[in-house]
Amino acid sequence: MDSITVKKPRLRLVCLQCKKIKRKCDKLRPACSRCQQNSLQCEYEERTDLSANVAANDSDGFNSSHKLNFEQQPVLERTGLRYSLQVPEGVVNATLSIWNAEDMLVIVGLVTFLDYPFAAHSLAQHDQYIRALCASLYGMALVDFSNYANGIPCEDTSRSILGPLSFIEKAIFRRIEHSKQFRVQSAALGLLYNAFSMEEENFSTLLPSLIAEVEDVLMQKKDCEILLRCFYQNIYPFYPFMDISLFESDLTSLLLQDDNNRWKISTEVKNVRKKIETLSLLTIVMAMALMHSKLDANLLSMVKENASESARKLSLLCHKLLCLLDVFRYPNENTFTCLLYFYVSEHLDPESPDCVLSPTNLLTLHHLLNLSMTLGLQYEPSKYKRFKDPEVIRQRRILWLGVQSLLFQISLAEGDAGKSNSEYMEAYLTDFEEYIEASSEYEKSSASESNVQMNDIVWNKYKFHVILSKLMSDCTSVIQHPQLFHILGNIKRSEDFMAENFPTSSIYQPLHEKEPNAIKVGKSTVLDVMDIQKTEIFLTNIVGSMCFLNIFDVLSLHFEKKCVMHWEEYEKNYHFLTLKSFNAYLKLAGLISDYLENKFQGNILESRGYIIDKQICFMLVRIWMFQCRILLRFSYKQESQKKLASSSISTNDNEKEDEMIVILERLIKHIRNQMAHLVDLAKGKLQDSYFGAYQTVPMFRYVVYLIDVGGLVSVTNGFWDKISSDGEIPPKVQQAVRLKWGLDCNNSRRIKQKLISSQSLQSFNQVLLCQMEDAVLSSSFAIKANTAMSQNTAEEFFNISEEEALNQLLENNNFDAFWDLLGENLSDMPSL
């Protein structure tokens, strides 16, 4: 067979600087004119690199010529840069086998799902200490409730340590009220659900009815225009899934003005599907703007309630309109735009009860990703020769970028990074760069400086997403076992890219009077590009920092387990990765505390809260979990050291143990203050506005209380002690704990033994503790937390007992609802 001729890679003549900012290059050597004018270092791709690639291709023969584009050398790795890992001496490379499906499974009542590797529940199950604490609190709550239901009085009415119900009573009551109020909700949009469609016989009567409902909810024209402007200025810049000019044009043909200065919706049969698409988009846009407006602290509570009710009605109407369009049977770009905004509205809803990302939320996001691929959005639009209209090409491009930005913002840090999507993203980036080099039309569409900057923001975030996806994909694989140094190298690459393209220094700099770098969207909306850029810098940094924290944390736990039997080989790894995770936590916590305290000197506007705050609520839970993980180790280590000190005969040994106990006491106080500081900040800024924060803030105030009274260890051991001592835990409670947390109550002695054994934390030693204390003392966040906090966090809860809390919760026939919240089936419990 004749050898197949392999096409040689084309040498890119554009210099790297001009290519980066997407400007025309005159290709002069050794330095182009633009780089000379701006005193930039001008560099071109080397032919030697390309010739090496050609040689490799030639040697591969027939099979190589049939590889997909994304299997060739990635566009982001052509620079030839080599990253120094900077690992301490003694840290060894190792093959990692981290994940166990058992630790990601969740079974609560009638719900079963496999969580993502870095999701909150998976991380809790991955750590034996947090897992034991969560299972103990959950089990004791079920026991108390079971005893109450059976009329069994509390064994100890004067408990020295309060249970969690005293703290979370109000949150549970509000959750019960919420479950009653929203008992019937619209189903998640998906392949298997459709209430009605345009093909039904009663469509001619159904549509006017829906239109009348929309008109009834909409306000006067001037108020609607204010809400649209609010959406354009505060929401659209971060979710630019549509062309505002086209949307406004569609509105002019849809809306008529009646005599009462209100909008009247046209009911002409002509282009009815297009009108329903526009109407569904209008309803969800207005719902999001209303939700944004109700976060204004200066609004009267009655106005907030009306805005919330109107937003909920508009959201439900949008859902009905999307069902009418039958969006999964008749997919197109316009309905996909509506679906994206509907999803964002549900995700950002301050009244959502989710404390962490729910499986429903993530499953819906994957529906959207799959639908985008059904539409063929994963391929650069220029690859389709049948698309001639530049508006269609632009729309398809922004929709692909849109769904990927949602994955980046919402699910990437959870460990949702499939290789298939990463490959599509990278191939898309390669094709797009080739397109802009060959196309003059793209340059015309982004000729202004502001447009260039906006494009840089979007594409830099996309490139960072590609890099992080590869990193997360390597870390979460259950089939391939990566090498530690390979992971560390990818982390370094990701950190460097984030620091270069999203520097946090710009959001801490004082604002100076200068003309806004404006870009016009639609007829009359002007956006400040620098303002958008600074908000994106913050959002990108907290996502990237969360990814790094999750990876370092899990690697630390992995080597902690290894050190139980092989401490000589892996202790250096454990110390290095624990310190890396601790520093990553301090950095992320510092960013979030600075945001909550408005420390960015006006660089991030208060009106951005609707975009940012929901993500902050979720990330705070992750940070508090990390603090719990560290506090549990400090506390158990302290107990172990006290036992060693009391049993030591040698004076020198006693002095060593005493010194370590003192260090642990200081560290416990530091982390306690950091947790309490973030809890207080969240209480002040988020708790009243966000239902999720309303539930999580008091729960972690309870953890602060346990630290203050020295009860963290005893509460963690409590459930397991109760099983071991009297064995009176009801079988249904034991089963519930086993299914939700994967801990078999029959092994309660073994579970507790692992917690209290000095061998479990033998490498969590003084060397590491001193390094952690140094990190705390050099952290501005830690210093600020120590200054801000007092010891009075839990005083308001001291005057209510567990039994009184249950009495208050279960009055007014709340029994069924409360049991539902615990995730259990009422039929398995005794009746009152």
From Swiss-Prot:
SUPFAM superfamilies in the cross-refs: Zn2/Cys6 DNA-binding domain
GO molecular function: DNA-binding transcription factor activity, RNA polymerase II-specific; sequence-specific DNA binding; zinc ion binding
Membrane in keyword set: no
Keywords for this protein: DNA-binding, Metal-binding, Nucleus, Transcription, Transcription regulation, Zinc
Matches recorded under Pfam families: Zn_clus
GO cellular component: nucleus
Main location: nucleus
Subcellular location per the Swiss-Prot or TrEMBL entry: Nucleus
DNA-binding region listed in the record: 15-42
Cross-referenced InterPro entries: OAF3, Zn2-C6_fun-type_DNA-bd_sf, Zn2Cys6_DnaBD
Protein's GO biological process: positive regulation of transcription by RNA polymerase II; response to xenobiotic stimulus
Function: Zinc cluster transcription factor involved in resistance to cycloheximide.
The protein's name in its UniProt record: Regulator of drug sensitivity 1
Taxonomic lineage: Eukaryota, Fungi, Dikarya, Ascomycota, Saccharomycotina
